[in-house]
């Protein structure tokens, strides 16, 4: 016995072990009225040829119909301008060194402030602007008083601070 799934229902056909696919197609034609030339039988993911034989007991065969036509073949597009290259950021060797400063004595000091938020954790440095420190990860901003910052650090302001 073989199960045959057609477009709208399932058929149960008695098939001998050595029977070929062509005779199964003729049985389907008698039961459903689908011409055997238009039938495409699929078993285990591959299409069966008319000369194939030796299907397993209680195998499920799917019936598909041959379709006419298809989509029109299209021309390959020809572009007039070349493709724009993506911008690759330059790799800076030892980029971590901009976060630390080493004295003559070998003492290491941090140049940037670490973010205090628990979501960031240790090792996340804040960006240093003229009047604030900004964390790019959690978007936390610490505003620095410009009068006290210039007096303590000895730094001048950004571009706007120059005269």
UniProtKB/Swiss-Prot annotation:
Gene3D superfamilies: 6.20.50.150, Phosphatidylinositol 3-kinase Catalytic Subunit, Chain A, domain 1. It holds the Pfam family ubiquitin. The keyword Zinc applies. PANTHER family: UBIQUITIN. One of its GO terms (molecular function) is protein tag activity. A zinc finger (C4-type) spans 115-138. This is Ubiquitin-like protein 1-ribosomal protein eS31 fusion protein. It comes from Caenorhabditis briggsae. SUPFAM superfamilies: Ubiquitin-like (SSF54236), Zn-binding ribosomal proteins (SSF57829). One of its GO terms (biological process) is translation. Keywords: Isopeptide bond, Metal-binding, Ribonucleoprotein, Ribosomal protein, Zinc, Zinc-finger. In the N-terminal section; belongs to the ubiquitin family. There is a cross-link at residue 70 (Glycyl lysine isopeptide (Gly-Lys) (interchain with K-? in acceptor proteins)).
């Amino acid at each position: 016995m073989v199960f045959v799934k057609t477009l709208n229902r399932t058929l149960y056909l008695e098939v001998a072990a050595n029977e070929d696919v062509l005779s199964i197609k003729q049985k389907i034609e008698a039961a459903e009225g689908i011409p055997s030339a238009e039938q495409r039988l699929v078993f285990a993911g591959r299409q069966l040829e008319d000369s194939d034989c030796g299907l397993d007991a209680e195998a499920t065969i799917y019936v598909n119909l041959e379709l006419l036509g298809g989509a029109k073949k299209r021309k390959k597009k020809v572009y007039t301008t070349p493709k724009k290259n993506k911008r690759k950021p330059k790799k800076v060797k030892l980029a971590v060194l901009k976060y630390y400063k080493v004295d003559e004595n070998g003492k290491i000091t941090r140049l940037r402030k670490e973010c205090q938020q628990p979501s960031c954790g240790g090792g996340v440095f804040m960006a240093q602007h003229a009047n604030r420190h900004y964390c790019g990860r959690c978007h936390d901003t610490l505003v620095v008083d410009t009068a006290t910052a210039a007096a303590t650090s000895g730094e001048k302001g950004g571009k706007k601070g120059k005269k």
